[in-house]
């Protein structure tokens, strides 16, 4: 038997008494009746629904246009008669198998549901039947009262096999999460696989969204439970391994960062405390008053340092201006150099760390795993792009610095610091020269008019003065005396004792000679033409010889040896003795003779005992 277009059953008048058990009835659904039902159930929409007319698969998902399945889904029912009966309209039907596909290509649409087109899923023709029901009418509520009405037939469900619908979600970083959900619970699709053109803020927002989606199914507080531990097997092994490596790298990076910060503090303290040069500078700073010491640390420039000293210690600034300015410049330069060394060290450590991470990233990339996406992107690319490693790799695209590059980089920083120090020093010197130009011109004029026997130069060649007329004006010039240069030599000596500057007391001098032993001190002064000649020493010590080799210049321009400088400084204390004891001192033992208050040079009355009047010079 078969059904006509209206679904009514008719007999084909074929004999069935040969094999009555093989009578089969094939029932097809009525398309017109199904269409009327669908039209009655269609929702009323105020705007056209663009989803109407698109084909769907068995799970009511939109099917791609290139899908091979183009046949409508329909229900097939296979039935056979339980016992032979020659009356076609009185047959008893046994349904032994039913295959139901509940959604057609143009079936009804739930407007409140959202759908996801998962590229990872195979075609609809390979899907397993979501539900299988087998029924039998031989037992249960079967009507055996002889009534031939088909509406009185009953069905007994003897077996039901259902498949729990599972949905696979694509998460950021190439990860997947398989959850149990119905077709109406599938979330809307996200563009996780195309993040290369997104900004950092957008990627962070997507990661947060994925975290919230994960928390919907697994609570954070239950991460240590057995259910959470057992559920991790749903993730691929490559993703689990990448997660473990990422957590280990992050923990190592945090520990290394903390250790580096601690080392920086310790090394910075050690550099400041152990630097010999900086320690000596600090000792020199400690010799000043607290106000001046605080100015060294508070001032950030030389001009600010000068302004602070003018307010707190104007007298000290006037007396020791050059020394304070040089000390401040040296102190700031040393601090800046220590800072540069620390910064270079930190840069080297950071470069080594980035180089090590780049090597690890290359090793991971060598064994990358591809997922089944449309573009077959690498999971390693997702992890490197979304994680901190990918961000650092974009910042540090090139290889790490080598040892030679690090040394050159360090030397460039040091050269830059030195150049800036030289520029600052030149500016300071230029300002000082402009302020003291009038005094310098005065000194040059006095140096050009020195009396006979005095010179403003350490040149030993004899000079002579000549008067010439130039442009109608008379001028005096100094030229070399060639005749005297053959037989004589000018030697710069100390104005107080007569020792040669830079050479000191001669090595062959062992003490006062026999000829000078009986001569008075005044006689020796008139003989050697010096205020307190070194020939009056009874026996020079090694300290006297060493000190006499040093050279000091007074503010008036006259030179003294280091031995006389020490004796002048000692004369300050000696001059405070009682007058009776002071009157008992004679000759070279009297402080006014070996350490006078005024400069002993001819026609010079400048003070030399006060502090800062004598300054050492070096050749």
UniProtKB/Swiss-Prot annotation:
- Region annotated EUC1 interaction domain sits at 201-335
State which pathway it belongs to: Protein modification; protein ubiquitination
Q: Which residues carry this modification: Phosphoserine?
A: 14, 29
Compartments in which it is found: Nucleus; Chromosome; Chromosome, Centromere, Kinetochore; Chromosome, Centromere
Output compositional bias ranges, type Low complexity.
11-21
Any one GO MF term held by the record is: SUMO binding
Cellular component annotations (GO), alphabetically ordered:
chromosome, centromeric region; kinetochore; nucleus; SUMO-targeted ubiquitin ligase complex
Q: If you read the UniProt record, what top EC class would you report for this enzyme, in one word? A: transferase
Give its E.C. classification number.
2.3.2.27
Where is the sequence biased in composition, kind Polar residues? 70-90
The record, for InterPro entries, names: E3_SLX5/Rfp1 (IPR038886)
Region annotation (Disordered) maps to 1-23, 63-90
Write out the GO biological process terms: apoptotic process; DNA damage response; DNA repair; protein ubiquitination; telomere maintenance; ubiquitin-dependent protein catabolic process
Summarize the protein's role.
Answer: Component of the SUMO-targeted ubiquitin ligase (STUbL) complex SLX5/SLX8 that mediates ubiquitination and subsequent desumoylation of sumoylated proteins and proteins containing SUMO-like domains for their degradation. The STUbL complex SLX5/SLX8 stimulates ubiquitin conjugating enzymes, including UBC1, UBC4, UBC5 and UBC13-MMS2, and mediates the proteolytic down-regulation of sumoylated proteins. The STUbL complex SLX5/SLX8 is involved in ubiquitin-mediated degradation of histone variant CSE4, preventing mislocalization to euchromatin.
Its UniProt domain note says:
The region between Ser-201 and Leu-335 is required recruitment of SLX5 to ub-hotspots via interaction with EUC1.
* Protein's name in the database: E3 ubiquitin-protein ligase complex SLX5-SLX8 subunit SLX5
**What organism does this protein naturally occur in?**
Saccharomyces cerevisiae (strain ATCC 204508 / S288c)
